[in-house]
Amino acid sequence: MTNIRKTHPLLKIINSSFVDLPAPSSLSSWWNFGSLLGVCLAVQILTGLFLAMHYTSDTATAFNSVTHICRDVNYGWLLRYLHANGASMFFICLYLHVGRGLYYGSYTYSETWNIGILLLFAVMATAFMGYVLPWGQMSFWGATVITNLLSAIPYIGTDLVQWIWGGFSVDKATLTRFFAFHFLLPFIVTALVMVHLLFLHETGSNNPTGIPSDPDMIPFHPYYTIKDILGFLVMLTALATLVLFSPDLLGDPDNYIPANPLNTPPHIKPEWYFLFAYAILRSIPNKLGGVLALVMSILILAIVPILHMSKQRSMMFRPLSQCLFWLLVAVLFTLTWIGGQPVEHPYIIIGQTASVLYFLIILFLMPMISLVENYLLKW
């Protein structure tokens, strides 16, 4: 008798995706982040759902409702901090996942890669809107500054900003719609994740060597299910440690001050996971130029497959490209640091140098080094 997981209409889809899926035998821990992102998404949706039961999206009561959740709701403090720090974990896993894709050449699966970029934008939009909801000082001013960037779009900019605000400033209408979209977007992200997996399973997984692994495949279960569960335990332990010992480590103290349109905080900055893009935005003295650079800092991932000049897929056997890759990582850390600093000397010039280096490495140096490596290997 055939096993039910192979015949049942629903179970056979799950079976072909998570049980009998042929996977390369050489996958390292860098391949854990996809499943970790799935866990992060589940944690965020669950904690977010319970938070939404107690939250009110009104400018008069939003801040107090978050205080009420932390003080009066059973384990409300835990829900709130799991949700806030869960977002940080989400982005740590996201950036490592994208970095893995860049290092090992996973971007050659163009459909999977493009859906991934779309997912990155969707998660960033969700996180931005979520940061506005507690209605603290940084929530209000962050929303004002970032939405105002759209006014740099020629001709329609000002109308577009007022349309998003639902008035002439960030106010009640803005908060209400941000809450609606913040609730809706994670479910759109979940649907996109399914499409992402659908495209991935059309081609099968890449592996660290970048060499086709068709002759050497192993079943996903039990080998990689066990490996993924270990990853879950490590990540959830890290998240629990952060939440229970220093829940405000990654937050901004200004967000414990209720939003006040008449008082601007000394340094307006987004959460740490947007600081690299914020630094690129600030490094250009022109508003429209800054907005374009900001968008391109993420959108540049879409042209990475076109810029792939190497005859090899992965960087595993390309030491020169590896050096450039880690230089890029160092540049991103520098940008993240600069994004959190005030706009003054020497931070301005460091930010501008790092921004130029970021685009220079991806657009010119990596393709050039790939061609040099091809030449050295007589390919």
From Swiss-Prot:
Q: Does the UniProt entry include the keyword Nucleotide-binding? A: no
Say which species the protein is native to.
Artibeus amplus (Large fruit-eating bat)
Q: Which residues bind heme b b566?
A: 97, 196
What membrane topology does the annotation report for this chain?
A: Multi-pass membrane protein
Q: What is this protein called?
A: Cytochrome b
Q: Which Pfam families match?
A: Cytochrom_B_C, Cytochrome_B
Q: Point out the signal peptide segment.
A: none
User: Where mainly located?
Assistant: mitochondrion
Q: Does the keyword Amino-acid biosynthesis apply?
A: no
Q: What does this protein do?
A: Component of the ubiquinol-cytochrome c reductase complex (complex III or cytochrome b-c1 complex) that is part of the mitochondrial respiratory chain. The b-c1 complex mediates electron transfer from ubiquinol to cytochrome c. Contributes to the generation of a proton gradient across the mitochondrial membrane that is then used for ATP synthesis.
List residues traversing the bilayer: 33-53, 77-98, 113-133, 178-198, 226-246, 288-308, 320-340, 347-367
For activity, the cofactor(s) needed are: heme b
Q: Where does heme b b562 bind?
A: 83, 182
Keywords, A to Z? Electron transport, Heme, Iron, Membrane, Metal-binding, Mitochondrion, Mitochondrion inner membrane, Respiratory chain, Transmembrane, Transmembrane helix, Transport, Ubiquinone
Task: Drop me one GO molecular function for this one.
Answer: metal ion binding
Any Gene Ontology CC annotation: mitochondrial inner membrane
Q: Where in the cell is it found?
A: Mitochondrion inner membrane
The gene name on file is MT-CYB
The record, for InterPro entries, names:
Cyt_b/b6_C (IPR005798), Cyt_b/b6_C_sf (IPR036150), Cyt_b/b6_N (IPR005797), Cytb/b6-like_sf (IPR027387), Cytochrome_b (IPR030689), Cytochrome_b_C_euk/bac (IPR048260), Cytochrome_b_N_euk/bac (IPR048259), Di-haem_cyt_TM (IPR016174)
Cofactor binding: number and manner: Binds 2 heme b groups non-covalently.
- Share any extra remarks: Heme 1 (or BL or b562) is low-potential and absorbs at about 562 nm, and heme 2 (or BH or b566) is high-potential and absorbs at about 566 nm.
In the record, the note on similarity to other proteins reads: Belongs to the cytochrome b family.
Please give the subunit comment from the record: The cytochrome bc1 complex contains 11 subunits: 3 respiratory subunits (MT-CYB, CYC1 and UQCRFS1), 2 core proteins (UQCRC1 and UQCRC2) and 6 low-molecular weight proteins (UQCRH/QCR6, UQCRB/QCR7, UQCRQ/QCR8, UQCR10/QCR9, UQCR11/QCR10 and a cleavage product of UQCRFS1). This cytochrome bc1 complex then forms a dimer.
Q: Which residues bind a ubiquinone per the record?
A: 201
